[in-house]
Structures are given as structure tokens and as C-alpha cells.
Curated annotation (Swiss-Prot):
Organism: Shewanella pealeana (strain ATCC 700345 / ANG-SQ1)
Source lineage: Bacteria, Pseudomonadati, Pseudomonadota, Gammaproteobacteria, Alteromonadales
Pathway: Cofactor biosynthesis; riboflavin biosynthesis; riboflavin from 2-hydroxy-3-oxobutyl phosphate and 5-amino-6-(D-ribitylamino)uracil: step 1/2
Binding site for (2S)-2-hydroxy-3-oxobutyl phosphate: 86-87, 128
Entry protein name: 6,7-dimethyl-8-ribityllumazine synthase
Transferase is among the record's keywords: yes
GO molecular function terms noted in the UniProt entry: 6,7-dimethyl-8-ribityllumazine synthase activity
Function: Catalyzes the formation of 6,7-dimethyl-8-ribityllumazine by condensation of 5-amino-6-(D-ribitylamino)uracil with 3,4-dihydroxy-2-butanone 4-phosphate. This is the penultimate step in the biosynthesis of riboflavin.
Length: 158
């Protein structure tokens, strides 16, 4: 049996992190977690990490698409925080963001790690950005590192 799986270390990986500025009090912690994970666990060098800041979660897919189209990166991490309010706006923003990022991954054959929090409350967002529920930015970075390696292994085997 042949099993293809990735590891986490990706010293030569070039990673773009596309970050929403909206809800920056949460998203800044997600970015810190992602960068820390890329450096400490992936051994990714500073010069191989590019951060792209956009206004909000709706803009993440377009920026990710432009990054992917450049062909200069091995993977993309999308970070943001969409917090439910009193209107259906949350559902549209969260859904379109998720759909758009998945489309980028499939269209450009590049891993796009979804680190966009979709929570009911501000407290839940804070918990997931580095307090008692961990840091989802760091988790998104781990997933990306593994997928970069999985795709490289598949390329070598197929």
C-alpha cells in the first residue's frame, strides 16, 4: 500500500497570508499565531512570508485569487473574523468568503487554508484567537504546511 501524506516542515515554502483588517482586535492575534507557526514549526523564513491586508472578509477571495495567479507562492492562508450581528449579513459574508476561497484553491491548484472565524459572539472570536480555544490562525498555518507537502509528494508520485 502506498500512502501519501505531508509533514509540517517546509523551509523553502513561499506563503502568502491574506488578512482582513475588519475586527482587527481578533484578526491581529490570528496573524501572530499563523506567522509564529510558520516560523517555529514550518521553519519558513521571514523573506518567504508575504502578508496582504484587505478591508474585510468579502475581499479575501479576490486578493487570494490575485496571489494565486502570480504563481509565486506555494500556499495561501486566509485570515479574518466574521461575527454574527442582528441581520442576515453574516450569512452572506461568511458563505461568499468560504465559497470564493475554495474556488481559488481549485482553480489555481494551490492550497488555501481557511482561517476565517465565523462566530456568534465577540467572546467566541476572542477565545479562538489565542485564548482558551487555541489560535485558529496557527491551526490554519499547520494545515497549510501539511497540504504544501502533500501536494509536493503527489507531484513526485504521480
Amino acid at each position: 500500500m502506498n500512502v501519501v501524506q505531508g509533514n509540517i516542515e517546509s523551509k523553502n515554502a513561499k506563503v502568502a497570508i491574506v488578512v482582513s483588517r475588519f475586527n482587527s482586535f481578533v484578526v491581529d492575534s490570528l496573524l501572530d499565531g499563523a506567522v509564529d507557526t510558520l516560523k517555529r514549526f514550518g521553519q519558513v523564513a521571514d523573506e518567504n512570508i508575504t502578508v496582504v491586508k484587505v478591508p474585510g472578509a468579502v475581499e479575501l477571495p479576490l486578493a487570494a485569487r490575485r496571489v494565486a495567479a502570480s504563481g509565486k507562492f506555494d500556499g495561501i492562508i486566509a485570515l479574518g473574523a466574521v461575527i454574527r450581528g442582528g441581520t442576515p449579513h453574516f450569512d452572506f459574508v461568511a458563505g461568499e468568503c468560504n465559497k470564493g476561497l475554495a474556488q481559488v484553491a481549485l482553480e489555481f491548484d494551490i492550497p488555501v487554508s481557511f482561517g476565517v472565524l465565523t462566530t456568534d459572539t465577540i467572546e467566541q472570536a476572542i477565545e479562538r484567537s489565542g485564548t482558551k480555544a487555541g489560535n485558529k490562525g496557527g491551526e490554519a498555518a499547520l494545515g497549510l504546511l501539511e497540504m504544501v507537502n502533500v501536494l509536493q509528494a503527489l507531484e513526485e508520485q504521480l
